[in-house]
C-alpha cells in the first residue's frame, strides 16, 4: 500500500503478533480506538482522510470503529458476518464481532472485497454484508480468489478498484 502512495498505520491486536495480553473482542476494540486517537489527536491526521481497512478478523474491530468515527470510508477484505457464523456456532447467544448488525448502522462509504473460493470465510459472508449495508457500497468479487491471495489473484484490478472507490466515495448525509 505504501508503494502505491497510501499511508498505512498497522498494528497487532492485544494477544496477537508482537503484542502481549489475551485476545478478546473488547481488547481488539480498545486497540483500534487507541490507533484512531493516536492518528487524529497525536499525529494530527484529519479524520476525513482516514480509510478504515479491515481484513478477515480485522473486519470486526474495523466495523466497530466505523460505527463511531467520521472516517473517509471503510474497506473490508474477506470479512465475516460474525465470528460464530464462520465456525458454525451462530446459535450461541454470545456471538462476537457481529459485523452483519453493524454494517446496517455505518454511514461511511463501504467497499467489500471477497474471493469466490475463500474456504476460511465463505464468499456468502461478503454478499450478506453487502446486502445489509446501509450507506453507499460496492462489492468487488475476485473470481477464484481465496482467503489470503486476493491481491495476487486480482493483480492490477485490485488497485484500480481501490483507487476508483477512494477517488469518489459518497458520504451519506
Regions from the PLM with identified roles:
Residues 108, 122-131:
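Short alpha-helix in the alpha/beta-hydrolase fold that links the catalytic acid
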Residues 44-56:
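Alpha/beta-hydrolase fold nucleophile elbow
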Residues 51-54, 77, 113:
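Short beta-strand immediately N-terminal to the catalytic nucleophile in serine-hydrolase-like folds
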Residues 127-131, 135-173:
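C-terminal catalytic histidine-bearing segment of alpha/beta-hydrolase fold enzymes
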Residues 1-38:
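Membrane-embedded segments
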Amino acid at each position: 500500500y505504501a508503494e502505491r502512495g497510501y499511508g498505512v498505520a498497522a498494528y497487532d491486536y492485544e494477544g496477537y503478533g508482537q503484542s502481549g495480553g489475551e485476545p478478546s473482542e473488547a481488547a481488539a476494540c480498545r486497540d483500534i480506538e487507541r490507533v484512531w486517537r493516536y492518528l487524529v489527536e497525536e499525529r494530527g491526521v484529519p479524520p476525513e482522510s482516514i480509510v478504515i481497512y479491515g481484513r478477515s478478523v480485522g473486519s470486526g474491530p474495523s466495523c466497530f470503529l466505523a460505527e463511531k468515527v467520521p472516517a473517509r470510508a471503510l474497506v473490508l477484505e474477506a470479512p465475516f458476518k460474525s465470528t460464530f457464523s464462520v465456525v458454525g456456532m451462530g446459535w450461541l447467544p454470545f456471538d462476537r464481532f457481529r459485523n452483519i448488525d453493524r454494517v446496517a448502522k455505518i454511514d461511511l462509504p463501504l467497499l467489500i472485497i471477497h474471493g469466490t473460493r475463500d474456504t476460511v470465510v465463505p464468499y456468502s459472508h461478503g454478499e450478506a454484508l453487502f446486502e445489509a449495508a446501509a450507506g453507499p457500497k460496492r462489492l468487488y468479487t475476485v473470481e477464484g480468489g481465496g482467503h489470503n491471495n486476493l491481491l495476487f489473484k486480482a493483480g492490477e484490478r485490485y488497485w484500480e478498484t481501490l483507487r476508483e472507490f477512494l477517488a469518489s466515495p459518497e458520504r451519506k448525509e
